[in-house]
Amino acid sequence: MSYYDYDYGHVSVAQKKEKARKSMAKLKKTMPNIEPVVIDGTAIAKTWWGKAWNKNLESYADYRNRIGRGRSYVREGAVLHLKLDSGAIHALVQGSTATPYRVEIGIDPLDEKTWQQITSLCNRRIESLEQLVSGKFPKELESLFTARQEGLFPAPQEIHFHCSCPDSARLCKHVAAVLYGVGARLDQNPLLLFSLREMPVDQLIKKTIADKMESMLKNADKKSPRAIGDDQVFDLFGV
C-alpha cells in the first residue's frame, strides 16, 4: 500500500477545489496559456471519441483497479494543465501539497502494420473529416477502431508515465486523472488522438476519395444498362 492510500484526514471537495483554484491563479502568472481540464456535469466524456478512450483504459486489468482513483480528481478540477503533443502528454495536477505535481506520459506511435490494416479496412467507409470527427461512421469501424491491441487506442504497454509525487504506486491517482483528462480533451478535438499516436489522419480521408475516384474512372468507359442505344432512340420516336 502506498503512502497516499492511507487516510490522513478527510478533505472536502470544496477544500480541494479551493486549493486547485489558488494554484491555478498562481500558475497563470507564469503560464498565461495554461490549459486546465474543466468537466461540466457528471460525465467525464460525452462524445464517441472521449468515451472510447476511457472505455479502452478501463478494459485492461492492469488499469481497472487503479484508474478509478483519478475520476474524482479530474471532476474536482485537479488537472490544472493538460497539453497533448505528438507522442506525449504534459500535465500539472493539484495534489495534497501546495505545489502541483508534474505528470509526463509517453504514448507509443501506432505501428505501421496496424495503421495500414486500419486504412485498408476503412476503404470507402469514411466520406469526410466531419464524419470521422463526429464519430458517425459504420458500426464495423467502431469495432475496428476500438479493437484491443490492434485498434487506434493504446494498450497499457504502449503508455509510459512518470509523476513527481512520492506515491509508490505504479499508476498513481494523478496519472489516472490525467488519463481521464485526455478523454475530456478528445471530446473537444478528436484529432488530438491521431496526433498523439502519430497517425496521418488525412490518409483515411484521402484513401477513401482516391478509391472512389479510381472506381469511377474504371467504370467511366463501361456502358450503363440504363443507357439507350441509337436503334432504341429510333424505335422510341417511331422513326
Feature-to-residue mapping (PLM):
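Long, low-complexity, compositionally biased intrinsically disordered regions
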Residues: 1-239
